[in-house]
Amino acid sequence: MTESWNGSSWTELNNLNTAGAYVAGGGTQTSALCSQGGDRPAQNESWDGTSWSEISEQNTYRDQSGGSADSNVSGLIYAGEAPPVTTITEAWNGTTWTEVADMGTARSLGSGATGGQSGGASSALGVGGQIAPGARTGLTEEWVAADIQVKTLTTS
């Protein structure tokens, strides 16, 4: 289900082409990405403000990943269950997925946040997650494309 928030209420929009679970991604009301785990292969879709379109799969299948995107042509999908939990990070450029600098700590079920006004595939935060069955973490990592490095912000 896709819904849009206008500041006071939600409006239902067009649904994803393929229903799934563990959706990661981000974007705006007019341009977004999502990656769904739970099924093989992962289903990736691009939002143009009106409808979802299927796009290519990541290079490495992962379930329960984190994600960050500022549009449907700039995003990251990171970590997740390969299985086991993994550090793999891939960037979307609007056409293809490319493996980039991986996270420092393998995890699944983490949340993602786009960093700054031009986030997506240039900066992101990976927050929390599960590092082993039943073992959760509050670890936050920052991904910055200019440095091609991962920085540990906090540990738990």
Report each predicted region and the residues it spans.
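Polar, enzyme-active/binding microenvironments
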Residues: 1-156
